[in-house]
């Protein structure tokens, strides 16, 4: 009987661990800069998101697809219901033409709540 109660208690504990998670929800996952001048210098966009889960959300890393994009993000845990940000800065120097770059956002979000890796995008057209 003790084994049955112990097994049942452990099952409830494990289930409760997996039922709690953080959940990142972006207002939009892509930004179009439109036409930008190469001589105009770097351009930036601030992606806003909300933690729709019931546990704190932590952005572990933001990995750009190339060296032309520099990310900055909320470093502190985002409490449930609160908002955070990721800023994507693009350097158009020496890169004329159409572009579309991704940023891989890695969070502490539960793997069950796929995806753990989220992608956001910036795009535009660099004019000389």
Show where each model-derived region lies.
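Bacterial Sec-dependent N-terminal signal peptides
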Residues: 1-23
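Beta-sheet-dominated interaction scaffolds and their linkers
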Residues: 19-46, 52, 126-128
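Surface-exposed loops/turns
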Residues: 38-39, 80, 95-96
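Buried hydrophobic-core signal for structured, non-transmembrane domains
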Residues: 45-51, 88, 103-107
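Surface-exposed binding patches on compact interaction domains or structured appendages
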Residues: 54-83
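Short, hydrophobic beta-strand segments
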Residues: 86-94
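Terminal connector regions
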Residues: 96-127
């Amino acid at each position: 009987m003790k084994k049955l109660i112990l097994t049942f208690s452990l099952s409830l504990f494990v289930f409760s661990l997996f039922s709690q998670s953080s959940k990142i929800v972006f207002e939009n996952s892509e930004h179009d800069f439109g036409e930008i001048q190469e001589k105009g210098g770097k351009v930036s966009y601030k992606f806003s998101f909300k933690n729709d889960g019931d546990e704190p959300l932590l952005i572990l890393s933001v990995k750009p697809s190339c060296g032309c994009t520099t990310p900055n993000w909320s470093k502190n845990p985002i409490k449930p219901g609160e908002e955070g940000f990721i800023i994507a800065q693009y350097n158009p120097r020496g890169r004329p033409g159409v572009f579309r770059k991704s940023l891989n956002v890695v969070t502490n979000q539960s793997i069950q709540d796929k995806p753990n890796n989220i992608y956001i995008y910036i795009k535009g057209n660099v004019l000389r």
